Amino acid sequence: MIDHKVHLSEAFFGRRKGKRLRNSQLARIKMLLPTLKIDLNNSAPPDLTSLFPSKVREVRLEIGFGGGEHLLHEMEHFPQTGFIGVEPFINGMAKMLMSLEQHKQHQNHLRLYDDDATRLLDWLPNASLDGIDLLYPDPWPKKKHWKRRFINMKNLNRVARVLKIGKKFRFATDIDSYANWTLYYFTHHHSFEWEAENLKDWKTPYPLWPGTRYEEKALREGRTPTYLTFIKK
């Protein structure tokens, strides 16, 4: 049996594990994840492109990639970009690793982290990322749980430190209260500017957007997605 150790911090709330993993998934967690996982016990390289065996021109981060569908899609379309994917939910990580067995060409420009994203953000060098995606994060819809949302001023300070000037933080949700919450925090932070001029700018999916399983469910249930983009000043 694999002991999948995690370390909780002030920013993580929720399940680490759901359905029982199949033996094939457990094998990928044991054998493949260690080859791709970022070890925070080592110092971060000044140039993050050195994390990747393949030559990459830039590095982007996706926080909470779920089963990895969007991340895999991005790697298909941006082969000269190095990607860092964070997913503390072990079932999502296992699904991603299974997909990587079928897309081995992506392994050389992908690095993974299976714990709290704030730990990774604190480890990264200043102005080291060319983009950050946070797509359909847990909205914690009950008001008493809103403090558990990833978007807060402390985490925006983290994001502002590691994101390069002129680069984008993209946020998608189908929960209106979380969209409004996110707008409030970003527009009250001195390091970001909201990239929007009219309604279609936050109702139109991002370029090359593949959609997600969660988004399909939201649309079936009558919820309208919101796509927010913020530029680091």
UniProtKB/Swiss-Prot annotation:
<dbReference type="GO" id="GO:0008176">
    <property type="term" value="F:tRNA (guanine(46)-N7)-methyltransferase activity"/>
</dbReference>
<keyword id="KW-0819">tRNA processing</keyword>
<feature type="binding site">
    <location>
        <position position="116"/>
    </location>
    <ligand>
        <name>S-adenosyl-L-methionine</name>
    </ligand>
</feature>
<dbReference type="InterPro" id="IPR029063">
    <property type="entry name" value="SAM-dependent_MTases_sf"/>
</dbReference>
<keyword id="KW-0949">S-adenosyl-L-methionine</keyword>
<comment type="function">
    <text>Catalyzes the formation of N(7)-methylguanine at position 46 (m7G46) in tRNA.</text>
</comment>
<comment type="similarity">
    <text>Belongs to the class I-like SAM-binding methyltransferase superfamily. TrmB family.</text>
</comment>
<feature type="binding site">
    <location>
        <position position="87"/>
    </location>
    <ligand>
        <name>S-adenosyl-L-methionine</name>
    </ligand>
</feature>
<feature type="binding site">
    <location>
        <begin position="212"/>
        <end position="215"/>
    </location>
    <ligand>
        <name>substrate</name>
    </ligand>
</feature>
<dbReference type="GO" id="GO:0043527">
    <property type="term" value="C:tRNA methyltransferase complex"/>
</dbReference>
<feature type="active site">
    <location>
        <position position="138"/>
    </location>
</feature>
<feature type="binding site">
    <location>
        <position position="138"/>
    </location>
    <ligand>
        <name>S-adenosyl-L-methionine</name>
    </ligand>
</feature>
<keyword id="KW-0808">Transferase</keyword>
<feature type="binding site">
    <location>
        <position position="62"/>
    </location>
    <ligand>
        <name>S-adenosyl-L-methionine</name>
    </ligand>
</feature>
<dbReference type="InterPro" id="IPR003358">
    <property type="entry name" value="tRNA_(Gua-N-7)_MeTrfase_Trmb"/>
</dbReference>
<comment type="pathway">
    <text>tRNA modification; N(7)-methylguanine-tRNA biosynthesis.</text>
</comment>
<feature type="binding site">
    <location>
        <position position="142"/>
    </location>
    <ligand>
        <name>substrate</name>
    </ligand>
</feature>
<dbReference type="InterPro" id="IPR055361">
    <property type="entry name" value="tRNA_methyltr_TrmB_bact"/>
</dbReference>
<dbReference type="Pfam" id="PF02390">
    <property type="entry name" value="Methyltransf_4"/>
</dbReference>
<keyword id="KW-0489">Methyltransferase</keyword>
<protein>
    <recommendedName>
        <fullName>tRNA (guanine-N(7)-)-methyltransferase</fullName>
        <ecNumber>2.1.1.33</ecNumber>
    </recommendedName>
</protein>
<feature type="binding site">
    <location>
        <position position="174"/>
    </location>
    <ligand>
        <name>substrate</name>
    </ligand>
</feature>
